[in-house]
């Protein structure tokens, strides 16, 4: 590979990486800002309020047009599982970045 092509290739990689890092920083900011709300959801899911709300939903005591996905055990379970897997993935990627792999 000649010098010009190599420099052009490295320039493209640098620009692409800078864009990705910028996008990731913005998403990480949103994730961090959402943590208190996510913790609130996690606490709700294991609270007596959730069980009471789910029972009311099962007994058709809530408005029919009320969005109640949060009362689905599968929905919350899937979200909590995704959170766990995402956290592991972030740690694994961070380790690779720090080791420069």
Place the predicted regions along the sequence by residue.
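Long, low-complexity or tandemly repetitive, helically biased scaffold regions used
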Residues: 3-101
């Amino acid at each position: 590979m000649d010098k010009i092509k190599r420099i052009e290739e490295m320039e493209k990689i640098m620009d692409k990486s800078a864009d990705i890092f910028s996008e990731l920083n913005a998403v990480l900011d949103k994730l961090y800002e959402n943590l208190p709300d996510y913790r609130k959801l996690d606490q709700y899911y294991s609270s007596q309020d959730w069980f009471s709300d789910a029972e009311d939903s099962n007994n058709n005591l809530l408005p029919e047009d009320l969005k109640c996905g949060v009362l689905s055990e599968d929905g919350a379970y899937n979200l909590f599982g995704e959170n766990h897997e995402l956290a592991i993935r972030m740690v694994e990627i961070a380790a690779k970045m720090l080791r420069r792999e």
